[in-house]
Amino acid sequence: MAQHSVYFPDAFLAQMREAMPSTLSFDEFIAACQRPLRRSIRINTLKISVADFLALTAPYGWLLTPIPWCDEGFWIERDDEDALPLGSTAEHLSGLFYIQEASSMLPVAALFADDNHPQRVMDMAAAPGSKTTQIAARMGNHGAILANEFSASRVKILHANLCRCGVANTALTHFDGRVFGAALPEMFDAILLDAPCSGEGVVRKDPDALKNWSPESNLDIAATQRELLESAFHALRPGGTLVYSTCTLNRQENEAVCLWLKETYTDAVEFLPLNDLFPDADRALTPEGFLHVFPQIYDCEGFFVARLRKISSLPALPAPTYKVGNFPFIPLKGHEALHITQAASAVGLLWDENLHLWQREKEVWLFPAAIESLIGKVRFSRLGIKLAESHNKGYRWQHEATVALACPNHAHALELSPQEAEEWYRGRDIYPQTIPAVDDVLVTFQHQPLGLAKRIGSRIKNSYPRELVRDGKLFTSNV
């Protein structure tokens, strides 16, 4: 395999020699860092089972090797990699899998370990969405996730990935994570803090990742991490589980941050060892029970994961002084709720009691019921999924609702050919051989919903969002 030319500061190498257990080879560490990272994917079980995905993609000749800590995760090797980018395959476009680095699947595995079934979860640093979508899949779109992202530009990317993967149980916020301990004290059953870090573990993906590295910056970052972890711990309910993770390798940003929390809240913090998370986990185990994954251990990105439990309540922090503002939505109940539920069902959109109908002017939304108790406590960037816009002739059903809620076996679903599906993704109208009998047509491919479209004569008018339209080579050569 080709080698990367990775930039290693001398001080970094000295730090790694000190941090690395004596059971590991430093030469193997350097060699692993210089190998390109193996590609990996996670099957999105909100849309397809692992068995059905493997059967669907079997004709492609993809070599899929299971990732030991994630039942839905696979390292992938493809003969057609140069001909067709993984992100342009039909299965990726319809949300059947997420391109995700193998070690970044570890934190969510830890969050749900030991048969943990949280109902309200916060992902404190969520973009671009790999872990939020993984959490949603583990929850089966039930309960609720608050997905926070501090970077405004990344919130849009986060929402696009949630939409593609059919996630319906999530609220988005755009805050510095340090506000949540005061704003939402002891409100969450589980919290994932995949903390901003120095990124020492990503050199296999970015050989220049350490160009701006310094020991001083590590200490500055660790100070921010301590504040974020403290905020997350305050937002966690007693008995709840918190996972702290980074994609860096130094102890200051990893073990030291967790030990600081334990020293600060001695009687409230319990470390939960991860030695049984997956077979062979003990190869990366620290004395505290954390996983400190150097890249040569499992041939993946460098990573750190710690799991802890909050065993007692904490005194509340001073209440935040910001104003949330008036909430512009009202709940829909009774006849109005029944009417839109029946109209949605007629076009193949179905949901259960986990989602509640709300309205803002002519917009109809579905909010996860488990998030409603947070309304008025924090300002949301986006809450739930937009179901429809009402107009004189009925409802204009929204793309994100179709992807998340549509029943692909609906009586009036129109299954496209590969060529027609590619035309759909290019934003072009479809002229099917068999004209549907209804005006609102659920368009599917590989029995996955692509959108709801209007039939106009013999034409199916394309409703694929303009910002998602693809050019360039797509997947027809692959199906």
From Swiss-Prot:
It is found in: Cytoplasm. Signal peptide: none annotated. Gene3D superfamilies: 3.10.450.720, Vaccinia Virus protein VP39. One of its GO terms (molecular function) is RNA binding. S-adenosyl-L-methionine binds at residues 125-131, 149, 176, 194. One of its GO terms (cellular component) is cytoplasm. The active site is at 247 (nucleophile). Its EC number is 2.1.1.178. Pfam families: Methyltr_RsmB-F, Methyltr_RsmF_N, Methyltranf_PUA, YebU_pre-PUA_dom. It is an enzyme of class 2 (transferase). Transmembrane segments: none annotated. One of its GO terms (biological process) is rRNA base methylation. It comes from the Bacteria. It catalyses: cytidine(1407) in 16S rRNA + S-adenosyl-L-methionine = 5-methylcytidine(1407) in 16S rRNA + S-adenosyl-L-homocysteine + H(+). Keywords: Cytoplasm, Methyltransferase, RNA-binding, rRNA processing, S-adenosyl-L-methionine, Transferase. Specifically methylates the cytosine at position 1407 (m5C1407) of 16S rRNA. Belongs to the class I-like SAM-binding methyltransferase superfamily. RsmB/NOP family. PANTHER family: 28S RRNA (CYTOSINE(4447)-C(5))-METHYLTRANSFERASE-RELATED, NOP2 YEAST -RELATED NOL1/NOP2/FMU SUN DOMAIN-CONTAINING. This is Ribosomal RNA small subunit methyltransferase F. It comes from Salmonella arizonae (strain ATCC BAA-731 / CDC346-86 / RSK2980).
